[in-house]
Amino acid sequence: MYAFKKKYFLIIESIKDLDLRNIKIHNKFNVIYRNFNKSENIDGIKKFRNQCKLKQIKFFIANDTKLAVAVKADGLYISAFDKNLKSLHYIKSNFSIIGSAHNMKEIKLKILQGCNYILLSKLFKVDYDDKAPHLGIIKFNIFCNKTSKNLVALGGIKIEKLNYLKDVNCNSIAILSELKKKPA
């Protein structure tokens, strides 16, 4: 039996990575667009953002406040390496702020940055880096108990690991690499 969560965060690196027609449930999904590939034009991103709005999918831009404002995104995603506190003034507007962290020190920084949700990484071992440390379910749950913020499980979440998510003490999960796989 799979564990159902209140929110799902889908992290994409290109607007071509996700076909929104496959999302049937409204108000549960959030798309985080990591604009590493600067070749996508702003009009294409605006069109994708409008498609998200029609499907009631929240759309976030990673690490680029100017682009987030330009495309009228629902909010901003702040990576773990961004230690800047400038994002605080966006709290008063209708922007939501999502952050990313790997340890308790970074979680505290994301709270100072005004994050509504904090993606805590890596929950499970990841394929792309065998030696990278991962938290595991027990340590992740300890972090959840130490903070009042909404922590989101990220990292190593694959189809075969979905059953383990019922033991994770959080309401949301984030998926990156599973989105890139081609359907069978």
How should these model regions be labeled?
Residues 26, 71, 113, 146, ...:
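Structural motif
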Residues 44-60, 83, 87-103, 133-156:
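Alpha-helix-loop-beta-strand connector modules within alpha/beta enzyme cores
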Residues 6-12, 29-33, 59-61, 76-78, ...:
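Hydrophobic faces of well-ordered beta-strands that scaffold small-molecule active sites
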Residues 31, 68, 110, 118, ...:
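Conserved, mostly hydrophobic/aromatic
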Residues 94-127, 132:
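Internal catalytic-core helix/loop-beta-alpha segment
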Residues 76-88, 117-134, 156-184:
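Glycine-rich phosphate-binding active-site loops on the catalytic face of alpha/beta enzymes
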Residues 11-24, 63-66, 102-109, 158-163:
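Short, acidic/polar
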Residues 17, 27-91:
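N-terminal active-site wall of soluble small-molecule enzyme domains
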